[in-house]
Amino acid sequence: MKRYLIFGAGAIGASLAAQFELNGIPYLLCGRGEQIRHIQAHGIRYVRPEGARSLGLQACADRSELVLTQGDVLVFTTKTQDLELACRDWAWLPVAGSGPARTASELPVLTPQNGLAAERIALRWFSQVYGASINTPARYTELGQIVVGGYPEPGLVVVGRYPQGEDELAAGIAADLCRAGYLAESRPDILRWKAAKLISSVRNNALDLFEGPSDRLQAYAAALAQEAIAVLGAMGISPARAQERRHSVSHWGIAPGCGIEPGQQSTWQSIARGASHEVDFLNGEIVRLGRLYGVATPFNQAIQQAVGQLCQPGRSAQGVCRGQIDQLLSAARELAARAG
């Protein structure tokens, strides 16, 4: 039987562990820092639209306590900027029991990060990489509490072998996620599904840190998405469409009054907690790929630069610092003029 080792106790990792706990799927939540220690000592307060409950989770804060086995699947739920360190930490740990895997590097790895960089990073250390595109409206801003507002299922997941392919393990992971309550499926073209999620992340995530007239915010969001679509097109990637899902998702959404607030997505939450953000691997990924494929990306470049400046040490001492959309528009137009 598979056991899922979940590395990272944030919104995605802890909610995944909670769903596994509630549905009898073998798992272990691994992490470091205050959150995992709190979970070990007190469990977690897991808030869903149907109510809140306190859960004891199987958790590990010390690698020396962990024995890897042949049936383990490693699930890295850290943000992309932290993934390389996590891969280095875990790849060369020994695997117990008789079987083909001698070190963790030979065990299958699941990467549900936003963007397109995680799988490429993981391949440097792991031979079996499975990408995942996950849509789980979740909030982690308070120690020991995770809010998940997806309803009726906590989230939507697509799994596939990277860079392409659909096999028995991918199908098995998707089946386990369905047992855990998610609406999940395996597909052979995981890059297309991750590309579709990247467009959404690029359009909305970093823009939560800016304020101004709604029409200008919407226009900027549209420009971010248009640049992402152009870059992906230059790469030969056609993003997946919602109607391609094998399961209907027309019934699914964010429950009203569930604690998931507009304008407070993962980047806003990270900065609110004083943690690092992933904008360099979202908008910054579009900028990087645009440079490689000869596509101008001034709007994504401007917001990447602006978020980097907003998040300099000492800038967020009074909470989440916000930029102004008019200044951001001016910066993007200046970059576009230089490129033109």
Give names to the regions the model predicted:
Residues M1-A52:
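NAD(P)+-binding Rossmann beta1-loop-alpha1 motif at the extreme N-terminus of oxidoreductases
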Residues R3, P26-L28, P108, Q128, ...:
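Residues at the starts of beta-strands that form the adenosine-phosphate
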Residues I44-A61, S201:
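N-terminal glycine-rich dinucleotide-binding loop that anchors FAD/FMN and/or NAD(P) in oxidoreductases
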Residues P112-K197, R203:
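Rossmann-fold dinucleotide-binding core
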Residues V202-A223:
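N-terminal glycine-rich phosphate-binding loop for ADP-containing cofactors
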Residues Q218-G340:
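NAD(P)-dependent Rossmann-like dehydrogenase/reductase catalytic/cofactor-binding core
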